[in-house]
Amino acid sequence: MEDVPKQAHLLPAAVDYRAKHSPDTVFAVLPKDDKLEDGFFDLTYAALAKAVNALAWWLDEVLGTIPATEKFKDFPTVPYIGADDFRYVLLVLAAMKTGRKAMFSFPANTPEGLARLLELSQSKVTLASACHKHIWSKPLADKPEIRTIEVPGVDTFVHDRPVEPYAYDRTYDEGTTGTPKPIVWSNRWIEEYIGDVAVLSRHAPADQKSAVYALCEGTRVPNLLPLSWGAGILLALQVPLFAHTVPVMLPPASIPNPPTADFIKAIGTYAPKGPRNGMILVPDMLRHLVREAAGRESLQQNEWIAYVGAPLDHATGDALTALGIRVQSMIGATDIGLYNILLNDPQGWKIHRFPAALHNYYLDRFADGLYELCTARMPNDPRHVFASAPELDVYRTRDLWRAVPGREGYWSNAGRVDDFVKLASMTKFNAIAIEQIVEASPAVAKCLVAGDSRLASFILVEPAPGVGPYDATPDSEVIERVWPAIAAANEHLLPEARLSKELTVITLPGKPIIRTAKATVQRRASLEIYEKKIEAAYAAAGYAKVPFTIWGEAIGDVGKANGHAR
């Protein structure tokens, strides 16, 4: 499929261009009903354009038509919380056509957080799917002037009935979609950081292709990331438009929270396949799937697997590579977008390259052979982090990298700045890397390593079901069962940083380590639950009380502390 011409790079214009020049080309695959086994249908660009027009007319009907003299000036915000379905994609496009901008908030945000977003965005109305209207009740408790409107289901807009076209004659210019509020993706940001990069990658030499766009080109990819996330909408709308990905939308009623390994295998069974297929998963899910034959068989239907949200342990990545699956990291930040990592060597999935001098990214020395990825402000920079902070000249991503010995220009991911534990001895190590080694054991469901400002680090272990303590096994026996995995991790630590049995703490029944929506660990929240048990382990091991919390925050009068010597 040909590139969208530059003057049609505004998203609604790009959809209309595709609908005119490639009407029967499939944009996305949508579910027929609430279950995976109910089947799917193809949504063409012609059908997409018609659905966007239908929703645009609906928005004008319920919100009022913005006068032509005022349209495309202030871009009033339309907040939406809903079921994880195609309405998110349609709302982005229809809001733009009607002179508005859609704002998506994660449904799990606190009422206080949602109220703050409404205040910052100066929202006058809220939208929601039927099953999510209640989420707005508390944030709007003292805002009677703001009403909530229910957005009808996808089939109200995606249908075979005729729809009058909704005119959209905007062409690309140097303006943005309005004053940045919470997180604004401007038209120029989409143009320069998605559209232009996709075209650049498509026509680049083989060794200079962007990983995201090279892999996604012409590939069917199940949409497993929440559409209220920046990455979710990016992979369901912008990347398909400019890189020809075909997102496979899943029936939201069937998606467990969090997704399970059985659900991922069911996608492999029921979701329609194309000539090229890929999948984007969090590392924790990949670890579960590669441990079982059915999981490996399901994953092998994909040409490539991308991991997001956290680093992938070497054992899991190597296992996927051995299955003939290409493994690739996709990493970025909502404030600045995707990092344009180049497509890696299939056999060298652990190491990465960056394009030279693209978007002012550079690696800045952090410590001990580690470098932090940074990006400097460019003239008239459209990235949100710079547009919203005029005084900021450099954005530090907090993502750390290590140069690969003997491979100039190649880097391995070394976690994040806040992934590192610094002991009282000033010995520093990557806790995430150690956790990945321990979690490779089938005896361990999840673990957390910490110990900032202590003489010794500790490990909190959530044993796998059947290992304990869910079968009333004493902690001491559980520790013996998981110890081989911890001992293997110790081989990668300096002697003073090694973990000990006496500072191995086992989680309690009904109180697992807390996960985020990305299946990564909520470190502080988990440690707060087990603060007393961990402090008791330090005391039993003979360590004196210290003026720091177990997550490393100073307490009391640090200047008068008499140390934490054994």
Locate the predicted segments by residue:
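Structural core segment of the AMP-binding/adenylate-forming
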Residues: L90-L93, K97-Y166, P272-R276, V282
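AMP-dependent adenylate-forming
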Residues: A14-A47, V62-F72, T171, T504-K511
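Gly/Ser/Thr-rich phosphate-binding loop
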Residues: Y172, F242-T245, R276-I280, V290-R353, ...
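Conserved AMP-binding/adenylate-forming
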Residues: D38-T44, W58-N109, N223-L227
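Conserved AMP-binding A3 loop
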Residues: D42-Y45, A167-A204
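AMP-binding/adenylate-forming catalytic core of the ANL superfamily
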Residues: P390-E502, P512, R566
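Conserved C-terminal "lid"/linker of ANL adenylate-forming enzymes
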Residues: V421, K446-L448, L455, W483-G563
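Conserved AMP-binding/adenylation subdomain of ANL enzymes
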Residues: I194-R220, L224-N277
